[in-house]
Curated annotation (Swiss-Prot):
Gene: ZNF780A
Protein name: Zinc finger protein 780A
UniProt organism field: Homo sapiens (Human)
Listed CDD domains: KRAB_A-box
Main location: nucleus
GO CC annotation: nucleus
Lineage start: Eukaryota, Metazoa, Chordata, Craniata, Vertebrata
Length: 641
């Protein structure tokens, strides 16, 4: 057997706390990946070494500078265990030990020749031959990193010392050619490690190994607290923080704490506004390279992760996992405040901010604060009007790619999520979950002013603005203000006249998809929502809720001018226009003005003569559905109350 002299210390790199702080987040990630992979190579090739402290810390995603070195007379206990103490002596300046050539080959493949320090040119040529698997009896002798002089490649890793390997693309310097080669694959796009299951390729072997566990389903790391299993030790360690609540790293800007320093570094870029990673397709900037890679999949439309239940495809594995929980109903993350459960930890974290009221992200334009950064980014589009994602079917633009994807399913007609209660289909799992609350009648969010309850927190926020009078969304065309951004968007289509949603039955067009859906029920006669008090059916859940207040007699909305009370807020708004005399909707044909938009629409049919609603009994046509319903009473003999 051909042997060479390599120890774990030969391929290990140590950092002080000061040196570690000099590294960028992607450099720290690369360091973790390479160190863990090299250690796994040594173990897989038969090296019986005890686990070094630095490996334990890296597996726990802690900082490697936290290693406490203990000076002992036995400097290499792991190598003595494998090869005997007589071959590894503290008095031996070379700190030599013979290792199989396969070990040296594996290490050199990962780290490059610069990982080792040779005492003369002859030894370098011998090592070069060993790298190429040349046959022969080569006794390689290499000096441990702990014996290296300060001019060696190991010393050059410290952030303020020499880094001889420069990337010609971006000018970044590296201490070893192997690190430069790995870095260059970012620019070249080279991904030599390909998954045979789904064809996905990776730059690093350790990334490939992690990915394969998604297909095999292997989850060897189990949480002792709750029994949940994970494919990677790092995932288990992150999960443990849920139980311990430990967050050591605090942001000095806003006081937010994190359980990992890398998360703190990422968070700090939000305050600094630094976004060094730019998409060449659309110019969008990101503060992390990983976010850029995720974003680029939007342009390539790559979706390698497919659901075995319904065939739906996703860009990212976590999206597939989240989607699968819709089929299984699994919700492992529960809120201790209200007992609500969630499919993802991120959703639980978002939900918990409802109870704490924390809103650290503030809009510089209008001062509005948000609990999540992505909510702030969405809000900013109201001020900028930016909508980079356009539908090729109808030309409609969106400010988020996810909104475009949702919209495209309208044209495709795909509705893979079906309600088991009533059979209604949805194009998104989130919409199905929202719909199911109609059947369960769950309403956990209660208004403190009037005790009105809501299914969703966003509904409570919108409702609260009725009491406060807050209307932050203003139309730039007519100055009208709204308490919801979606209401402003709906209103703006009045000025543009855009009606992209057309009924295939009668050709009638609508501004909103919701209006088209409601209209289509006129043709089908579908009324899935039944009142348990009187048995009356309704096309929409909101109509049923309005109807229920007839039985309860509750009228929470009172006019401050005259004291008249109403069951619905929209009825109060209509009534208030009697006092103000406001009539913003004017007919272009004759100049007549109306208080309500629906009054204008009715009036315009006098000019057009349009009568799309026909009685199936006698063939008589009407301009409004209410007129048709009144007419039907003639045939049925029913007297309207």
């Amino acid at each position: 057997m051909v042997h060479g002299s390599v120890t774990f210390r030969d391929v290990a790199i140590d950092f002080s706390q000061e040196e570690w702080e000099c590294l960028q987040p992607d450099q720290r990630t690369l360091y973790r990946d390479v160190m863990l992979e090299n250690y796994s190579h040594l173990i897989s090739l038969g090296s019986s070494i005890s686990k070094p402290d630095v490996i334990t810390l890296l597996e726990q995603e802690k900082e490697p500078w936290m290693v406490v070195r203990k000076e002992t007379s036995r400097r290499y206990p792991d190598l003595e265990l494998k090869y005997g103490p007589e071959k590894v002596s503290p008095e031996n300046d070379t700190s030599e030990v013979n290792l199989p050539k396969q070990v040296i080959k594996q290490i050199s493949t990962t780290l490059g020749i610069e990982a080792f320090y040779f005492r003369n040119d002859s030894e370098y040529r011998q090592f070069e031959g060993l790298q190429g698997y040349q046959e022969g009896n080569i006794n390689q002798k290499m000096i441990s990193y702990e014996k290296l002089p300060t001019h060696t490649p190991h010393a050059s890793l410290i952030c303020n010392t020499h880094k001889p390997y420069e990337c010609k693309e971006c000018g970044k310097y590296f201490s070893r050619s192997a690190n430069l080669i790995q870095h260059q694959s970012i620019h070249t796009g080279e991904k030599p490690f390909e998954c045979k299951e789904c064809g996905k390729a990776f730059r690093l072997h350790i990334q490939f190994t992690r990915h394969q566990k998604f297909h095999t389903g292997e989850k060897p790391f189990e949480c002792n607290e709750c029994g949940k299993a994970f494919s990677l030790l790092t995932l288990l360690n992150r999960h443990k923080n849920i139980h311990t609540g430990e967050k050591l790293f605090e942001c000095k800007e806003c006081g937010k704490s994190f359980n990992r320093s890398s998360n703190l570094v990422q968070h700090q870029s939000i305050h600094s506004g630094v976004k060094p990673y730019e998409c060449k397709e659309c110019g969008k900037g990101f503060n992390r390279g990983a976010h850029l890679i995720q974003h680029q999949k939007i342009h390539s439309n790559e979706k390698p992760f497919v659901c075995k239940e319904c065939g739906m495809a996703f860009r990212y594995h976590y999206q597939l996992i989240e989607h699968c929980q819709i089929h299984t109903g699994e919700k492992p993350f529960e809120c201790k405040e209200c007992g609500k459960a969630f499919t993802l930890l991120t959703k639980l974290v978002r939900h918990q901010k409802i109870h704490t009221g924390e809103k650290p992200f503030e809009c510089r334009e209008c001062g509005k604060a948000f609990s999540l950064l992505n909510q702030l980014n969405r809000h900013k589009n109201i001020h900028t009007g930016e909508k980079p994602f356009e539908c090729k079917e109808c030309g409609k633009s969106f400010n988020r790619s996810s909104n475009l994807v949702q919209h495209q399913s309208i044209h495709a007609g795909i509705k893979p999520y079906e309600c088991k209660e009533c059979g209604k289909g949805f194009n998104r799992g989130a919409h199905l979950i929202q719909h199911q609350k109609i059947h369960s009648n769950e309403k956990p969010f209660v208004c403190r002013e009037c005790e009105m309850a809501f299914r969703y927190h966003c509904q409570l926020i919108e409702h609260s603005r009725i009491h406060t009078g807050d209307k932050p969304f203003e139309c730039q065309d007519c100055g009208k203000a709204f308490n919801r951004g979606s209401s402003l968007v709906q209103h703006q289509s009045i000025h543009t006249g855009e009606k992209p949603y057309e009924c295939k039955e009668c050709g009638k067009a609508f501004r909103l998809y919701l209006q088209l859906s409601q209209h289509q029920k006129t043709h089908t006669g579908e009324k899935p929502f039944e009142c348990k008090e009187c048995g009356k059916f309704f096309r929409r859940g909101s109509n049923l809720n309005q109807h229920r207040s007839i039985h309860t007699g509750k009228k929470p909305f009172e006019c401050k001018e005259c004291g008249k009370a109403f069951r619905l807020h929209m009825h109060l708004i209509r009534h208030q226009k009697l006092h103000t005399g406001e009539k913003p909707f004017e007919c272009k044909e004759c100049g007549k003005a109306f208080r309500l938009h629906m009054q204008l629409i009715r009036h315009q049919k006098l000019h057009t003569g349009e009568k799309p609603f026909e009685c199936k009994e006698c063939g008589k046509v009407f301009s409004l559905p209410t007129q048709l319903n009144r007419h039907k009473n003639i045939h049925t003999g029913e007297k309207a109350s």
